[in-house]
Amino acid sequence: MSSESRENEVKAETKDEIANDGSPQLNGDNNIQSSDGHNDENEESLSRKRDSSGATVGDLKQEEKESMPKKEPEPTVKKIRGSGMPPPQQKYCLAIVRQLKRTKNSAPFKVPVDPIKQNIPDYPTIVKNPMDLGTIEKKLTSYEYSVPQEFIDDMNLMFSNCFLYNGTESPVGSMGKALQEVFERQLKQLPDAEQPAAAPVKKSKQKSASTAPPRTRRNSSVSSTSASVAASTAPKAASPAVLPEGKPRRRKNNSQMRFCSTVLKELYKRQYESFAFPFYQPVDPVACDCPDYFDVIKEPMDLSTIQSKLNKNEYSTLEEFESDILLMFNNCFTYNPPGTPVHVMGRQLENVFKEKWEARPKFDDATLVKQQEAETDALFDNGEEEEALMSEEEINGAKFAAVDKQISMLQDTLEAMKAKKMNRMRKPRRRDLTKEYGPITYAMQNELAERCNYLSAEQLSNVAEILREEMPWLRDTDEIEIDVGNMKPEVFHRIYRYVCKPDADSSEPASPVLMPTKPEKKKGRVLSETEQAEKIRRLQQQLDRFAGKTSPTSPESNNAANVSDSESDNESESSESA
């Protein structure tokens, strides 16, 4: 074998080894060749070169290539921002999580559970796969979910962990159930995957074949890649059947629905919140303490339900929208009689609606035809989806706050009615009586105590009523002790004016106290304790005599009484002469 043929053989072996390694190679013209095939001319030249045994070098290398395991090229999958989830679904799921984190029931679910900080060391042994809203949001922002079902599974895992560890009746379990209801309500409007644009069948096949990943995805409500391939290969006549059902579509009377949306947003304005909040969400018979509501109202309606129907394009005419608004007001007026706070609020909101509704423009047939020609049946863009989602979420998020506000307002109204009733029963107080009449002296106290002994039954009843008004804790007692020394200044002055100076205060409906003329002479002298006791004993004896009783009294006591009377009379006369 010549040296020239030997060199060619070595070169051919080198080229084959490079080709087996899968790296690019250069031919004689410096053109890049892929590892999948050889140049036809090069293969023919190699087949002509034989070794000393008569075997073809190209045949030997071909056998080696066939015996080696073939490396299948990995399919190149083009993902959107690193995720298989379409952008509308990605954006909607992220908006759901962020809205849930803003609700008041999301506090236990915002961050991962810390068993040490929360003093629940058995949590990791019970909950094997913890999950929280913060982790789900992080996975959404890093595009770790390929289909919405993976996101839904993580949300359901979070709620299942809550119910597993806390139960459904505990405070945390109740918060989890409320949060799950909001999530499931918002999930119903999850948009479907974007459908491929209308294109020739061959191009759609090539595109779907090059971008479809070979792995199997979970079943979900969203159309998968295989479904999109089937839709692209289906006849054009069957294409409307595979359009997403849950996706809102533009109505041909879009201008009318836009006006309805404007009116509804007007009713949600802050300036009408004081009388519009009872209509923001459906009536809760338990929270509003009206268990017979659904027995009276057969078709309940509220603004949040109307907003939801408007977002789903369930209204086709203005009359349908107006009918639901009027139904809401009629329900209010049917259940709440005239004069009640909710009835008055309903009338105020109805006037606002009528004012806005009368200003609606005229939608003639020619205008609708032009709109039908100008507008397409394309799906909502992402901005409109997010706006509709946020409006729905804001309504749902304000549900509990509005209910609490309504209950608080009704309680305040009840307290105001009770206070008004009590004010009618009370008489106006006179303040600053201490400054007006001066300090309370010991002589004033003795005078009041002495005059109270001569009050009639009606006057004593009036004094007791004054004490009950000034001292509420005495209202439930039948017997009231008049303690002159421990009275408040305003109470003392009021009773003192009533008993001792009935003519000085014309506002008090008091009759003058009938007092005997003799005790007036003793005004300048204060009796001692012994004299007061003796006087009480004498009065008791007089009462017994009037009642027909005879009390055994010793002559010594009678003499002592006569002596004390003469002494007291002499002292009083001497004080008057002085």
UniProtKB/Swiss-Prot annotation:
Residues 566-578 have a biased composition (Acidic residues). The modification Phosphoserine is found at S221, S223, S224, S226, S239, S511. One of its GO terms (cellular component) is nucleus. Pfam families: BET (PF17035), Bromodomain (PF00439). Residues 219-242 have a biased composition (Low complexity). Its main location: nucleus. CDD domains: Bromo_BDF1_2_I, Bromo_Brdt_II_like. Residues 84-190, 251-360 form the Bromo domain. Residues 1-89, 192-254, 504-578 are annotated as: Disordered. GO terms for biological process: chromatin remodeling; DNA repair-dependent chromatin remodeling; regulation of DNA-templated transcription; transcription initiation-coupled chromatin remodeling. GO terms for molecular function: chromatin-protein adaptor activity. Transmembrane segments: none annotated. Residues 430-510 form the NET domain. Disulfide bonds: none annotated. The modification Phosphothreonine is found at T225. Residues 22-36, 550-563 have a biased composition (Polar residues). Keywords: Activator, Bromodomain, Chromatin regulator, Nucleus, Phosphoprotein, Repeat, Transcription, Transcription regulation. InterPro entries: Bromo_Brdt_II, Bromo_chromatin_reader, Bromodomain, Bromodomain-like_sf, Bromodomain_CS, NET_dom, NET_sf. Residues 1-18, 37-52, 60-77, 526-537 have a biased composition (Basic and acidic residues). Component of the SWR1 chromatin-remodeling complex. Component of the SWR1 complex which mediates the ATP-dependent exchange of histone H2A for the H2A variant HZT1 leading to transcriptional regulation of selected genes by chromatin remodeling. Belongs to the BET family. This is SWR1 complex bromodomain subunit bdf1. It comes from Schizosaccharomyces pombe (strain 972 / ATCC 24843) (Fission yeast). The lineage of its organism: Eukaryota, Fungi, Dikarya, Ascomycota, Taphrinomycotina. The gene is bdf1.
